[in-house]
UniProtKB/Swiss-Prot annotation:
Metal-binding listed as a keyword: no
Keywords for this protein: Ribonucleoprotein, Ribosomal protein
This protein's record includes keyword Metal-binding: no
SUPFAM superfamilies per UniProt: Ribosomal protein L30p/L7e
Cystine bridges: none
Identification of the protein by name: Large ribosomal subunit protein uL30
């Protein structure tokens, strides 16, 4: 089984640059306090690292 991480949106994309809004969409997040379980890859971790004020990793599984 592949390792996964749980990512939670903690900030609003309102009044944020378009690239940050697109990064949230790429992670599958669109509303406050939503969570997604995603595959643990360098690409996903890099996306979360680019927007630490909007999304955080809350759990690592596997």
């Amino acid at each position: 089984m592949a390792k996964t991480i749980v990512v939670k949106q903690i900030g609003s994309p309102i009044r944020r640059p378009a690239i940050q809004r697109e990064t949230l969409k790429g992670l599958g997040l669109n509303k406050m306090n939503r969570t997604r379980e995603l595959e643990d890859t360098p690409a996903v971790r890099g996306m979360v690292a680019k927007i630490p004020h909007l999304a955080v990793i809350i759990e690592e599984r596997g």
